Amino acid sequence: NNPLYLYNIGYLYHKEKKDVAKGIEFYEKALVADPNYADALYMRGLIFVDESNTVVESMNKLTRSPAALKKWEELDKKKKSLLASAIPYFEKAYKGNPEDIATLDALREVYYKTERMEDALRVKREADAVRAKKR
Protein backbone atom coordinates (compact mmCIF):
# COMPACT_ATOMS: atom_id res chain seq x y z
CA ASN A 1 0.00 0.00 0.00
CA ASN A 2 2.73 2.42 -0.97
CA PRO A 3 1.06 5.73 -1.95
CA LEU A 4 3.77 6.57 -4.50
CA TYR A 5 3.30 3.21 -6.23
CA LEU A 6 -0.50 3.61 -6.24
CA TYR A 7 -0.23 7.19 -7.47
CA ASN A 8 2.08 6.16 -10.32
CA ILE A 9 -0.34 3.44 -11.43
CA GLY A 10 -3.16 5.99 -11.31
CA TYR A 11 -1.13 8.45 -13.34
CA LEU A 12 -0.36 5.84 -15.99
CA TYR A 13 -4.02 4.92 -16.33
CA HIS A 14 -5.15 8.54 -16.30
CA LYS A 15 -2.58 10.16 -18.57
CA GLU A 16 -1.05 7.38 -20.66
CA LYS A 17 -4.00 5.02 -21.16
CA LYS A 18 -6.64 7.78 -21.00
CA ASP A 19 -8.67 5.65 -18.56
CA VAL A 20 -9.82 8.34 -16.16
CA ALA A 21 -12.01 6.02 -14.08
CA LYS A 22 -9.11 3.65 -13.43
CA GLY A 23 -6.83 6.61 -12.72
CA ILE A 24 -9.31 7.88 -10.13
CA GLU A 25 -9.47 4.42 -8.57
CA PHE A 26 -5.71 4.38 -7.98
CA TYR A 27 -5.49 8.03 -6.91
CA GLU A 28 -8.14 7.24 -4.31
CA LYS A 29 -6.18 4.15 -3.20
CA ALA A 30 -3.09 6.34 -2.83
CA LEU A 31 -5.14 8.73 -0.69
CA VAL A 32 -6.35 5.86 1.50
CA ALA A 33 -2.70 4.89 2.03
CA ASP A 34 -1.76 8.53 2.72
CA PRO A 35 -4.64 11.04 2.94
CA ASN A 36 -2.17 13.93 2.59
CA TYR A 37 -0.35 12.68 -0.51
CA ALA A 38 -0.12 15.99 -2.38
CA ASP A 39 0.41 14.62 -5.90
CA ALA A 40 -2.64 12.35 -5.71
CA LEU A 41 -4.70 15.20 -4.24
CA TYR A 42 -3.61 17.51 -7.04
CA MET A 43 -4.37 15.00 -9.79
CA ARG A 44 -7.74 14.16 -8.28
CA GLY A 45 -8.62 17.86 -8.30
CA LEU A 46 -7.28 18.21 -11.83
CA ILE A 47 -9.69 15.53 -13.08
CA PHE A 48 -12.61 17.69 -11.92
CA VAL A 49 -11.09 20.66 -13.77
CA ASP A 50 -10.64 18.56 -16.91
CA GLU A 51 -14.27 17.43 -16.69
CA SER A 52 -15.40 21.05 -16.29
CA ASN A 53 -13.38 21.99 -19.38
CA THR A 54 -15.25 19.33 -21.36
CA VAL A 55 -18.53 20.87 -20.18
CA VAL A 56 -17.30 24.32 -21.31
CA GLU A 57 -16.56 22.90 -24.76
CA SER A 58 -20.19 21.72 -24.94
CA MET A 59 -21.38 25.13 -23.78
CA ASN A 60 -19.36 26.84 -26.51
CA LYS A 61 -21.02 24.72 -29.20
CA LEU A 62 -24.54 25.85 -28.29
CA THR A 63 -26.47 28.20 -30.53
CA ARG A 64 -28.16 31.38 -29.32
CA SER A 65 -31.72 30.17 -28.99
CA PRO A 66 -34.15 29.97 -26.04
CA ALA A 67 -33.76 26.17 -25.90
CA ALA A 68 -29.98 26.49 -26.04
CA LEU A 69 -30.06 29.05 -23.21
CA LYS A 70 -31.76 26.53 -20.94
CA LYS A 71 -29.17 23.89 -21.85
CA TRP A 72 -26.38 26.45 -21.31
CA GLU A 73 -27.68 27.19 -17.80
CA GLU A 74 -27.78 23.47 -16.99
CA LEU A 75 -24.24 23.00 -18.24
CA ASP A 76 -23.02 26.09 -16.38
CA LYS A 77 -24.42 24.67 -13.15
CA LYS A 78 -22.66 21.35 -13.84
CA LYS A 79 -19.39 23.16 -14.62
CA LYS A 80 -19.52 25.11 -11.36
CA SER A 81 -20.32 21.96 -9.41
CA LEU A 82 -17.33 20.15 -10.90
CA LEU A 83 -15.03 23.07 -10.11
CA ALA A 84 -16.36 23.27 -6.55
CA SER A 85 -15.60 19.55 -6.18
CA ALA A 86 -11.95 20.22 -7.09
CA ILE A 87 -11.45 22.82 -4.35
CA PRO A 88 -11.06 20.49 -1.33
CA TYR A 89 -8.45 18.42 -3.17
CA PHE A 90 -6.41 21.46 -4.22
CA GLU A 91 -6.73 23.04 -0.75
CA LYS A 92 -5.46 19.90 0.93
CA ALA A 93 -2.63 19.55 -1.62
CA TYR A 94 -1.73 23.19 -0.92
CA LYS A 95 -1.61 22.56 2.83
CA GLY A 96 0.81 19.70 2.23
CA ASN A 97 2.99 21.63 -0.21
CA PRO A 98 2.29 25.39 0.03
CA GLU A 99 5.07 26.33 -2.41
CA ASP A 100 3.99 24.12 -5.30
CA ILE A 101 3.29 26.54 -8.16
CA ALA A 102 1.05 24.14 -10.09
CA THR A 103 -1.18 23.68 -7.05
CA LEU A 104 -1.26 27.41 -6.33
CA ASP A 105 -2.16 28.19 -9.95
CA ALA A 106 -4.86 25.51 -10.04
CA LEU A 107 -6.35 26.69 -6.75
CA ARG A 108 -6.34 30.32 -7.92
CA GLU A 109 -8.04 29.39 -11.18
CA VAL A 110 -10.72 27.29 -9.50
CA TYR A 111 -11.40 30.02 -6.94
CA TYR A 112 -11.71 32.53 -9.78
CA LYS A 113 -14.04 30.35 -11.84
CA THR A 114 -16.25 29.72 -8.81
CA GLU A 115 -16.38 33.47 -8.12
CA ARG A 116 -14.36 33.33 -4.90
CA MET A 117 -12.42 36.44 -5.85
CA GLU A 118 -10.87 37.22 -2.46
CA ASP A 119 -9.51 33.68 -2.23
CA ALA A 120 -8.28 33.87 -5.85
CA LEU A 121 -6.42 37.12 -5.14
CA ARG A 122 -4.93 35.76 -1.90
CA VAL A 123 -3.61 32.66 -3.67
CA LYS A 124 -2.32 34.76 -6.59
CA ARG A 125 -0.31 36.86 -4.13
CA GLU A 126 1.06 33.69 -2.53
CA ALA A 127 2.02 32.27 -5.94
CA ASP A 128 3.69 35.55 -6.90
CA ALA A 129 5.69 35.48 -3.65
CA VAL A 130 6.79 31.88 -4.26
CA ARG A 131 7.81 32.72 -7.83
CA ALA A 132 9.79 35.77 -6.62
CA LYS A 133 11.54 33.67 -3.99
CA LYS A 134 12.59 31.07 -6.58
CA ARG A 135 14.21 33.61 -8.92
List each language-model region with its residue ranges:
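Canonical positions in the second alpha-helix
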Residues: 29-30, 93, 127
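Short coil/linker segments at helix-helix boundaries
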Residues: 50-89
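Residue-level recognition of tetratricopeptide repeat
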Residues: 1-2, 37, 100, 134
